[in-house]
Amino acid sequence: MRNVFSFVVRRLWQASVLAMLIPIGGFAQAAAKKPIKVGIIGLDTSHVIAFTRALNDPSSKNYIPGFRVVAAYKGGTPDAKISWSRVDKFTAEVHDKWHVKIVKDIPTLCSMVDVVLLESVDGRQHLEQVKPVFAAHKPVFIDKPLAGSYKDAKEIYELGKAAHDPWFTASSLRYWSQTERLEHPEGIGRVLTYDVMGPTIREPDEPSLFYYGVHAVEMLYQLMGPGCETVSMQTSGNEDVVVGKWKDGRLGVMRGFSSGLYAFSITVYGTKGVLHSKRVPDGYGGLLHQITKFFKTGVPPVDPRESLKTIAFMQAASLSRARGGAPVPLSAVTK
């Protein structure tokens, strides 16, 4: 809460100074002409194209007024093919199509913007890249995965806490319309538990669930809530099954396929019936709504402590898989 308070105080101070400088009646006009300036770190993911289009192009179906991407830091890493194979293409598109200024380093970026989207596809880069953002006291959204390990994720949490700056991380699948519908289902009585499915595509340089399995993990946490204590993971061919045991005894199941089937689904079991989701995600609109709301209010829609637990869940799953599916307590990762 102290992080949020500090951010809100800064924004109120800025607004009060601006109000003193602008005649009454001209404030709304000035605000309309001065959108919140957004900076992007890491141009090696398709998210930067979707987000820039939504914030800069009024004709976009997901357009959100009042924001503009004005600067970006290229980033990228030679350690991950998913990064180096795409970063030049996305950088050129952001610069040439959307006229976003490409800057040489993150401190320069922070000096030009009000808020930051940390988008680097390799979560292992996030800790070092977010440090100058916290030093500049800029609110930041950190795209999935939060980090490449629980250790790095915990350090991000501690740095944000020390800087008194708000941040959050989330997958777009947390805000899929089907996730929201089935979080509070109708007509099936009391909810017992959930099964979710999503791709578990692997990258050679990323732990098993960190690159793409994170989407299904985030869905499961959004639906089940916090409180998972142990995780087990088994793999057969291209199929992965992860079972989390919550402290109230519920079992949340995540199923994924590392190749072949690319789909997302949710099944919710209640005392009076079962409901299933549709299998087509509806883009980034829901996530972008949460991000821009966060940038305006400074209130994270996902508790950072829950985000730490999702990283611990994935790391514990990797340990379980390496141990032949034996259950691994999250405490083995977080201690």
Where are these regions (language model features)?
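C-terminal substrate-binding/catalytic lobe of Rossmann-fold NAD(P)-dependent oxidoreductases
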Residues: D240-H289
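Bacterial N-terminal signal peptides
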Residues: R11-G26
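N-terminal glycine-/serine-/threonine-rich beta1-alpha1-beta2 phosphate-ribose binding loop
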Residues: V4-F5, I22, A28-A136, E158, ...
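N-terminal secretory signal peptides that target proteins for export/translocation
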Residues: M1-R10
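C-terminal helix-rich "cap/oligomerization" subdomain common to oxidoreductases
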Residues: A31, V116-L117, K296-K335
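Short helix/strand-capping hinge loops at secondary-structure junctions
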Residues: H137-P139, K144-P145
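A contiguous active-site-proximal alpha/beta segment in oxidoreductase catalytic domains
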Residues: L146-E206
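Rossmann-like dinucleotide-binding domain that binds NAD(P)(H)
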Residues: Y194-L261, R305-A312
